[in-house]
A protein has these predicted regions:
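Intrinsically disordered, low-complexity
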Residues: 1-65, 87, 120, 133-158
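Secreted/periplasmic proteins that engage bacterial cell-wall peptidoglycan
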Residues: 29-129
Length: 158
């Protein structure tokens, strides 16, 4: 009841704040089920040991990830486990971004490539626009902030 009254008070005094406050309260205690990006992703996503809400969680949910580490370390860690890495985007690849340049200066960022066009690629990502929020964006190619890509392996597609 107290929350309802507070929300009503916010609605009357600051209508622009209500949507943000409600979204934060609703998503914090119990994360909503995620939507698979590709038909070959298991119904509940791939097993995932990364913290919910982070970019690494979303990428690992939609890709078979066997390595650990912060986003900035994913390219090297995947390569060390024998995964192929490449300098160009492909559908299903994990895009690994360098720290800084609009991404976390300490941890870097990862996203999943969902489309590749002429001079662009489109990614699905979590925690780019806010904690726990999934968004898509189209990026111009070549991208100076990209470290590289981890493409899908045939054996990772059931």
């Amino acid at each position: 009841m107290k929350i309802l009254l507070s929300a009503l008070l916010l609605l009357v005094t600051f209508p622009a704040v209500v949507g943000t406050a409600a979204a934060t309260v609703a998503s914090a205690p119990h994360p909503a089920p995620a939507i698979r990006l590709f038909s070959w992703v298991p119904a509940d996503g791939f097993p995932d040991r990364f913290p919910y809400g982070q970019c690494t969680w979303w990428a690992a949910y939609n890709r078979h990830v066997t390595w650990n580490g912060n986003a900035a370390d994913w390219l090297a860690n995947a390569s060390a486990q024998g995964f192929h890495t490449q300098p160009t985007p492909s559908v299903g690849a994990v895009a690994v971004y360098r720290p800084g340049g609009g991404y976390s200066a300490l941890y870097g960022h990862v996203a999943v490539v969902i489309a590749v066009g002429r001079g662009t690629y489109t990614v699905s990502e979590m925690n780019f626009i806010g904690w726990g929020q999934v968004s898509t964006r189209t990026v111009r190619w070549p991208d100076p902030h990209i470290e590289g890509f981890i493409p899908v392996r045939e054996e990772d597609i059931p």
